[in-house]
Regions:
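N-terminal glycine-rich cofactor-binding segment that shapes the pocket for flavin-like pterin cofactors
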Residues: 1-445
Length: 445
C-alpha cells in the first residue's frame, strides 16, 4: 500500500524501518529495483478509499497507529517504478464500486502502455461503509449486489479493452495522412443493470489489452466471480483450507470452460529469514515488540464490520455475526487445534499479519516450508507481506532467493515479454476467458 503500513501494523516504529519515505520517489524506485533483482513477478499494491473507523466507532486508533492512513494513490507509482525496471509487474488494487468504467479502462490501458505490458488490476468491490460515505453514498450495496455490479462493470470494461479497437487500427501513415483507420474502431453500446455507455474507447490497444486480473473473494459469490474473471487469486488459511479453496474455485472455473492452467493461486505470508534460525527468531521477536496489537485489531474491526472494543477481552467469541469473522475464526481455530478465541487472543494474533501465518527461520528452513505449501496446498506462489522495509525484502532477495535457485524451484532469469506472458505464456487473455466473448469479429459487426 502507498502508506507506512498495510498488514503488519506498528512496524513503522522500528528504528530500521524506512516506510515513512513512502511519500518519495526514491523509496519506490529502490523497492522496485530490489524486487527485480530478486526475480519477483509482481509488486502488489493494496488500497482502500475510506477510513478504518469501526474500532471504537471512530478513526482515532487508525490515525494514531498509521493503519492504512494516511494513504496515497497507488496507480501513480506504476510509471515511476516501470521506468527503473524492465521485467517487474505491477498489481494495483482499484475498487470498481466508485469508478467510471470508461475512464478507469483508459487509466489501466495507459499504465499498460507505459509499463510495456506489465500492468495488473486487483479487482475489489469494497468493504468499508466509510468509503461509500466518502463517495457521497449513504451506505454500500449489499455483499452479493456489489458482485452483481462488478460483473456489469467487467462486461463494459471488456468491451472497451477487447472490442472497440482492432489490432491493426493504428497505421500511422504519414504519406496518406491516416493515423487511425475509422473502419477499424468500433462503437461500444452497453445497457447493463448498473452501467450504460455509448462510446468508442479512448485508448488504442495496449500490449495486454486487458491487464492481468487479480482477485481475492472468499465467499461463495466471490469465488464465482473469481472463477469467471480472475487469473491470479489470493487465498489464505491452513494448507488444507487453501487446497480446498483452490479446488473449489478451479472446479467453478472448469464448469465455465476454463482450465487450471489459466489460474495462478497465491497465499499470503510473512517471511522472516536470517543467516541462521536463531537470527531469524531474534528478528521476529524484535518485530513483535514493535508491532501494535490495537492497530491490528482496529484493522480487523474494519474488515469484519465488528467493533471489538465493545467486547470483554476474555469472553469467548461463540456466535460470529458476519461471514468475514466466521471465515477468519474457522481458519485460526483449525490452526490452533480447536482452541476458543477471545478478543485478547485476537489481539495477539493481530500483532503480525492476522490470518497470515509467519514463516520464520534460516533460508533452508523457509525454503522447505514454501516447498511444502506448493506441494500440499497446490499454491502457485506467495504474496509476501512487508514488515520492516527495506530489510524484509533485501533479506529475502539476498538469503532466500539463492537457496530457492540452488534447489531449482525458482527462476534464474526472467522470461521476456508482458506480465501475462511471464505468468501464462501469452500476451492476451485466452479464448476460454469471459472477456473473449466481447472481442470484435466481422460476423458480429
Amino acid at each position: 500500500m502507498n502508506c507506512i503500513g498495510d498488514i503488519a501494523h506498528g512496524l513503522w516504529t522500528h528504528p530500521r524501518d524506512d516506510s515513512r519515505a513512502y511519500r518519495t520517489s526514491r523509496y519506490w524506485a529502490e523497492l522496485a529495483r530490489t524486487l527485480e533483482r530478486g526475480g519477483f513477478d509482481t509488486l502488489f499494491l493494496a488500497d482502500i478509499i475510506g477510513a478504518n473507523d469501526v474500532w471504537e466507532g471512530r478513526p482515532d486508533a487508525a490515525l494514531r497507529e498509521g493503519v492504512q492512513h494516511p494513504i496515497n494513490d497507488p496507480l501513480l507509482l506504476v510509471p515511476l517504478m516501470a521506468h527503473v525496471t524492465e521485467h517487474l509487474g505491477f498489481g494495483v488494487t482499484v475498487n470498481q464500486s466508485y469508478e467510471v468504467p470508461h475512464l478507469f479502462a483508459r487509466r489501466m490501458s495507459t499504465l499498460d502502455h507505459l509499463s510495456e505490458g506489465r500492468a495488473a488490476w486487483n479487482i475489489v468491490t469494497g468493504f468499508l461503509d466509510s468509503a461509500a460515505r466518502a463517495a457521497g453514498q449513504t451506505q454500500q450495496l449489499g455483499h452479493d449486489a456489489r458482485y452483481d455490479r462488478a460483473d456489469d462493470f467487467m462486461a463494459l470494461a471488456y468491451k472497451l479493452w477487447e472490442g472497440s479497437w482492432e489490432d491493426d487500427a493504428v497505421v500511422h501513415d504519414r504519406a496518406a495522412r491516416i493515423h487511425t483507420r475509422p473502419d477499424k474502431v468500433h462503437r461500444i453500446r452497453h445497457e447493463g443493470p448498473y452501467y450504460q455507455a455509448d462510446t468508442i474507447f479512448l485508448s488504442e490497444p495496449s500490449p495486454q489489452r486487458t491487464p492481468v486480473l487479480f482477485q481475492a473473494g472468499a465467499s461463495k459469490r466471490g469465488m464465482d466471480f473469481a472463477a469467471r474473471h480472475a487469473e491470479c487469486i489470493f487465498v489464505s488459511g491452513t494448507k488444507a483450507q487453501a487446497r480446498e479453496t483452490i479446488a473449489d474455485i478451479t472446479a467453478r472455473a472448469v464448469a465455465l470452460g476454463r482450465r487450471r492452467a489459466d489460474l495462478r493461486f497465491f497465499v499470503g505470508t510473512i517471511v522472516v529469514v536470517g543467516a541462521t534460525e536463531a537470527e531469524a527468531r531474534e528478528r521476529f521477536a524484535e518485530y513483535r515488540h514493535h508491532a501494535s496489537p490495537e492497530a491490528g485489531l482496529a484493522h480487523f474491526s474494519a474488515q469484519t464490520g465488528i467493533d471489538f472494543s465493545r467486547f470483554d477481552l476474555d469472553a469467548p467469541i461463540t456466535n460470529p455475526d458476519t461471514q468475514a469473522l466466521k471465515s477468519f475464526l474457522e481458519s485460526v481455530t483449525t490452526r490452533s487445534g480447536g482452541q476458543v478465541w477471545t478478543p485478547r487472543r485476537l489481539l495477539d494474533q493481530m500483532v503480525l499479519g492476522s490470518r497470515h501465518t509467519p514463516i520464520v527461520g534460516s533460508a533452508e528452513q523457509v525454503a522447505d516450508e514454501l516447498e511444502s505449501w506448493v506441494r500440499e496446498a497446490d499454491v502457485d506462489g506467495f504474496n509476501l507481506i512487508r514488515t520492516v522495509v527495506p530489510e524484509c525484502f533485501t533479506d529475502i532477495v539476498d538469503l532466500l532467493v539463492p537457496e530457492l535457485r540452488a534447489r531449482g524451484v525458482y527462476k534464474k532469469a526472467y522470461t521476456p515479454g508482458t506480465l501475462r506472458h511471464k505468468l501464462f505464456g501469452t500476451d492476451r487473455l485466452p479464448d476460454r476467458h469471459a472477456a473473449a466473448s466481447f472481442r470484435f469479429s466481422p460476423a458480429s459487426a
